[in-house]
């Protein structure tokens, strides 16, 4: 695990983060709904709690939140906490959804990616956006942008960080990235099996307890691969090739 150096950086979603000592300051995209999300993170044991349960506003009118600086997952670690992450997500997905939360952020993320995608991937993005819009979803509590980088180590173990896309919807979206990376050949079978088995054992509602999970995961996984293909560096070739196969 690593806490990393102190520096300002932008995120793929348009937010900005500064680390100052033991505090992480996050400037969110204008208009990001934060009041209900902060209240959830302050009370729910699946999240690293904020230092303030209400947002501030900077000189440009952008909402600002304050967080404790916690160790995050080091991608160079030999082992990743797939089992712990699966149990954490199942716990979140089984929790009652508080009133006032918006929908999760996948539709907005896919739309942003569509505007940045290379020409050959735009038709795929349009097709996935149409399928997403037509998808009937339950109103469960979801993180909305989950991957291993969204884990922070708190006093009692791993918890979730980054509330920008927390909302209501199908919990299958929180399994989208590992599912998509596994389908693209970028996540080993053992890791995917450990993650899926632990999620099912914890009662996670995103997939059937037994049988093929892919009818539920197919669209979220395809969306996750497209998003990663547009944003990625070292794995871009494999992800773009996976997108080409999806487009056929």
Which stretches of residues belong to each language-model region?
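Regulatory N- and C-terminal appendages and interdomain linkers associated
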Residues: 1-5, 34-37, 62, 238-248
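Active-site acidic catalytic loop and adjacent metal/ATP-binding pocket
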Residues: 6-25, 130-173
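A conserved alpha-helical element in kinase catalytic cores
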Residues: 24-65, 71-91
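Activation segment
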Residues: 30, 72, 158, 166-168, ...
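A glycine-centered beta->alpha junction motif in the catalytic cores
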Residues: 63-77, 94, 111-115, 222-237
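A cross-family kinase active-site recognition segment
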Residues: 73-123, 137-139, 168
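Active-site activation/catalytic loop segments of kinase-like enzymes and analogous catalytic loops
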Residues: 172-205, 222-237
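All-alpha amphipathic helical-bundle segments outside canonical DNA-binding/catalytic cores
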Residues: 206-221
């Amino acid at each position: 695990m690593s806490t990393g150096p102190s520096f300002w950086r932008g995120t793929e979603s348009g937010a900005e983060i500064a680390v100052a000592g033991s505090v992480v300051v996050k400037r969110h995209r204008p208009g990001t709904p934060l009041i209900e999300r902060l209240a959830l993170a302050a009370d729910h044991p699946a999240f690293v709690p904020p230092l303030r349960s209400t947002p501030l506003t900077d000189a440009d009118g952008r909402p600002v939140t304050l967080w404790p600086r916690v160790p995050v997952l080091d991608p160079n670690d030999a082992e990743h906490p797939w089992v712990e992450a699966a149990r954490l997500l199942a716990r979140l997905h089984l929790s009652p959804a508080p009133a006032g939360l918006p929908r999760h952020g996948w539709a907005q993320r896919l739309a942003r990616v569509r505007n940045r995608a290379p020409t050959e991937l735009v038709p795929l993005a349009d097709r996935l956006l149409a399928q997403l819009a037509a998808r009937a979803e339950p109103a469960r509590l979801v993180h909305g942008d989950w991957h291993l980088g969204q884990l922070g180590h708190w006093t009692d173990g791993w918890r979730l960080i980054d509330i920008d896309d927390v909302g209501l919807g199908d919990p299958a979206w929180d399994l989208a990235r590992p599912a998509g990376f596994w389908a693209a050949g970028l996540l080993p079978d053992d890791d995917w099996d450990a993650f899926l088995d632990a999620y099912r054992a914890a009662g996670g509602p995103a997939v059937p307890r037994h049988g093929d999970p892919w009818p539920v995961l197919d669209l979220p996984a395809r969306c996750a691969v497209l998003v990663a293909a547009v944003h990625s560096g070292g794995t871009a070739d494999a992800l773009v090739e996976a997108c080409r196969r999806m487009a056929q």
